[in-house]
Amino acid sequence: MTMINPLSYPVPSQYSYTYNNNNNNSNNSSNNNSNNNSNNNNNNNNNCGVPNVSYGSNLNQQSMAQDLRVPEQYSISSPSPKKRPFNSTMTTSPPTPTLLSNSPYIHGSHIVPQYSPQLQNVYNTPHQSSHSIHQPPQQTPNIFNNNNNNNNNNEKSNNQNFGNTLFNSITNNSSNSSNSLIQQNNLTNNGSSSSSSSSSSTNFNQNNNFINSSNDSIYNSNICSFYGNTSSSSSSSLNGIESPPSVELMDDDIEDQLREYISPVIWGMMDNYAREQFYNAIVEFINEEISFRSLLLELRVIAVMDVNYKSIFQFLVDLFLSIEPNQKMVNYLRDNGVEENEFNIDLKSLELSSDNDSNQKKKRERIRKSVSRGLRNPPNKWAKEESQKLIQLVHEHGDKQWKKIAHQIGGGKTGAQCAQHWKRVLCPAIRKGSWDEDEESKLFNLVEKHGQSWKNVASEIRTRTDIQCRYQYFKSCMSREVQWSSREDEILQKKVSENNQQDGTININNTRDISWMDVSKAMARGRQTKIPRTALECKTRYFQLNFGGAPIQIVVPHNDDHLNNPHSPLNSLLQDQNCY
């Protein structure tokens, strides 16, 4: 490994022995200074970008001319680049899922293609455990630790929010299972571990220089930062390939299943350059530099080493549709630039299945609502036979035992509904139609007594329901807010004369025989006002025009307390000059 010239970059005296002492002394020094450098060692173990190697006598054989300065793009003082490379060596792919079992690349023994030198450099290198070098704790000045720590912290923060951010941007109203799908692109981003010392070799130290102009070695040494850091002290080999890294199981089984789908594509079907492209596209999308449509455009050009899946874009489209095969997902992908020929499913059959599913869902919803209505809130419509049976049962059991009556009627009717239907519709004491002047005057007196407690008002009126009382009261108040016109006065005088005419003469003294309800209906036919005049209003207006003076006081039998109160709501309503 190429080291930094201590003459060019001054090193404190307490660290200078690591450049001159041999391997045996380094072990003793590490034990003596373990307490002082514990925090530094923890940081070094978390940084998979800087390999921990021993600095023995083999480094002294290298001439000082070989110690070059740090390149400008990787200078110590320069900030970390925007698009950061990966931070660890690549590990092998996990077992192949069922979805990719037909792939010509995955099928068989996972042989690395010849045109992928990066993969062969890692995968096809024999496991040389006998030549491994003991690695003492890192005690040299952490020249690259600051930058690497910043990179790792940024990458961890991005990776932690990667799944939720990307999923919320991709499928706004999709199911929660799609969130697990996008999270698998991290491939255990939050897992933290250090590289194994037993699997390191001299060949690894020679071919993986951190300061190197070759981008391949940088990608090769920094891949762990995005795809997750893994560790395994003992790894078995299969056909010359190490076993897949140990992955911590998630709480949700769906996440484990989705990881099995995506892991073979990322690890076994993409080279380092494709992973770099994929990583940069994801970072730009998370930083809201590009839209989801632009992200799909960039994913189109990232090729994978499989003839079945030409790009990671096509793989993700197929995976989206396999996770959520419905028309809603198809429409969303179409809106973001996916063409018809890029769907590897039969859209017509999908539409038919979606229609069937929607119909079944609507049918289940109707059944659920009907059952709910039948048990708790059945429809208000009563059949003629049910109404007749209710009348018969009320005559037999009275108007108090509504639960017993409802049980005998059946059909999901409750006792409250039977009582309501009887009191509001079927009770012979309840009057229908217009209110006469006596009912209306009694209504205003009861409103003055009980306020707008319509149940109490209706219980004393006895001939009207609570709904009828409420409606009539507000209609009367609104009608009195409109002043009488001269045309209305003429029609009122004419209708009263026609109703009270006897033998061609008008009996002014016999106003009790006048049907003010008929007069009110005749006034309503003239359509002079939007709200028809009530019977009490017509009577009051007629006495004001013919007899003069203050409006007539309506006396309700057995309840004349309101006459003693000149400021009562009834008298104030009747005496309001704007009403006449």
Curated annotation (Swiss-Prot):
UniProt keyword annotation of Transmembrane helix present: no
Biased composition (Basic residues): 361-371
Spans traversing the lipid bilayer: none
Residue stretches making up the HTH myb-type domain: 368-430, 431-482
Biased composition annotated in UniProt, kind: Low complexity: 20-47, 87-101, 126-203
Span list, region Disordered: 1-58, 73-101, 121-203, 354-380
UniProt GO BP: culmination involved in sorocarp development; positive regulation of gene expression; regulation of DNA-templated transcription
GO (cellular component) term, any one: nucleus
DNA-binding region: 402-426, 454-478
Myb-like domain boundaries: 484-546
Task performed by this protein: Transcription activator required for the culmination, at the time of the fruiting body formation. Regulates genes involved in the cell differentiation within the fruiting body.
Protein name: Myb-like protein C
Organism: Dictyostelium discoideum (Social amoeba)
